Structures are given as C-alpha cells and as structure tokens.
Amino acid sequence: YSSAASDVYKRQLLDNDKLDIDGLERLIERLIKGGVHGLFILGTTGEAQSISYRLRHEMIKETCRINAGRLPVLVCISDTSIVESIHLAHVGAECGASAVVSAPPYYFAPGQPELAEFYEDLIPQLPLPIFLYNMPSHTKVNFAPATIQRIARNPQVVGFKDSSANAVYFQSVMYVMKDRQDFAMLVGPEEITAECVLLGGHGGINGGANMFPELYVDLYHAAVARDMETVSRLQPLVMQISSSIYTVGQHGSSYLKGLKCALSLLGVCDDFVAAPFHRFNVPEREKIRKALEALPFCPELKP
C-alpha cells in the first residue's frame, strides 16, 4: 500500500436499509476508470455508523463482487464493539478484501494505554492486515504518535490514515514511524493531500474523488513527481470544490449532503442520506448545481 493513492467512495442508499446496487456499480466503475489505486468502504463518507450490520455486510459483499479483484479493497471495521469489528473483518476476508481499517472505539473515550491495549487485543484476532485510522473529530480520541509506534510493532499493522487535518501531527507520526519503510502514511482531508505527499506521505483517501477521480489522481501523481506547476494548477480546483460543494448549509452534515447531492446531479447515484440526516431541498440542490457548473471540467448535469 505504500505507493498507492487510495480514494474513498460513498455507500449508496435508496432508504435507511436498502443498498443502491446500480448506483454502487456506476460509482465503482467511475472510480476504476478514473485511475484510483484502491477502494475504501464503510468509513466516514460511507456513513457506516448510521447503518445496520446487515447492510454493512451487504456493502462489503457487493463491493468485492463488482470490483472483482481489480483494485485493493479496504474495509473499515470501526465500532464500539470489538466483537463486531472482528466479525466485519472476517466478512471482508471471506469476500476478498485486502485489508481492514479501524478508528478507535468511540463514546467511552479510552486513554492512550487503553487504546494500545485495545489494538493489541484486536489485531491478533483479525484475518487481514490493518490500517489505523485517526478521526478525532468523530471519535473524540487522538492516537498519540508513541501509541501508533507501539501498536505498529506488530507487522500486521501496515499503515495509518489521518483525518485530523493537522499537518504537524501527520509529520510527527511520519517521524516516529520512519524506521518502518513498509508503513503507509495516508491522509484523509483532500485539501492537504498534495502537501502531505510532497513531505513524504504515500497518498490520500479523498471523498472528492467520488465526483472527479481524475482530478485527485492527477494531483497525487503530480505531488509524487514533484511537478509543482501541475500541483499549483490542480490544488485550487480541489479548494474550489471544498469551499463550495462541502459548505452549503453550514451544518455538520454539509459535507455528506453536498457530496451526495453532487453525485446525484452527475448521474452516479441517489442522494439519499441515512438518518438522522436528510437530502438537500431544492434551494440547496441548486447551489450545488451552480457550484458544479462553475468547475472548468463539469459535464452535463441531471435535473
């Protein structure tokens, strides 16, 4: 995974417990055609914590079926229950996933010693390699660099995804992990992916790639090649998407709603958002339409 730029894709729903399989297939094919290096499911953008375990299992099975071994599939197994995390990992392994991804248990916030002990208990029970996943805004827990270093003594820990949006923290983790040349360092926020790759990171898991995978893949390759002219040309487009499509409504759900609405307008999938949220109404949808139309590469949109 150390040379991969993995791009996340959203879970597709028709209602709170029904998967939009046609939309999922269109999205996976769009991502593969766009050149992404991997598929990451059941993460934040995938609304995993809002759906049933039955639907999570179906999502894993359908993704692996549609992908048919073309790209590595990373399955997020984050949960408050270690038993359910292990179960999700085994479903992933049975379906042909390449690795699992795990954020800390949330609700009861563990201290750093407890966090390390949790993973030292979890990892030997997993059938696949694991990426640690830092998402402090949602879990209220932040992996200390020393904790990552301790957990990653186990070679089954193959990488780290950081969604803290803190580039200094990301560099701190890179520094303590410098002796693990096989350890992949991935970043979540697309706004700083190029920066992190230029400073030695290995890629990004970016929600915006659901809409325009070529943009994020091209930016990744430009950063790897130290092609600053291309980075300087593409980075403002990433920021244009971030500042327009993800900010409509100014709510905690604005990112999810904006991305799903955009995918609907692009003809990829339905814009249903799992409870407690709801899809954008007409005024917000029109704002997303205008934001898409303002992009220089926007195709014809759906009504």
Q: What does each model-found stretch correspond to?
A:
Residues 33, 194-303:
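Structured C-terminal cap/extension of enzyme domains
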Residues 124-125, 138-242:
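Catalytic alpha/beta core domains of metabolic enzymes, predominantly
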Residues 1-5, 9:
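Single conserved hydrophobic/aromatic residue that forms the stacking wall/gate
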Residues 24, 56, 60, 85, ...:
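A general structural signal for well-ordered alpha-helical segments in protein cores
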Residues 6-7, 37-38, 72-74, 98-101, ...:
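Structural preference for beta-strand elements that scaffold enzyme active sites
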Residues 75-78, 163, 186-187, 206, ...:
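Active-site-adjacent beta-strand anchor residues
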Residues 13-142:
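Active-site beta->alpha loop and helix N-cap motifs at the rims of alpha/beta catalytic domains
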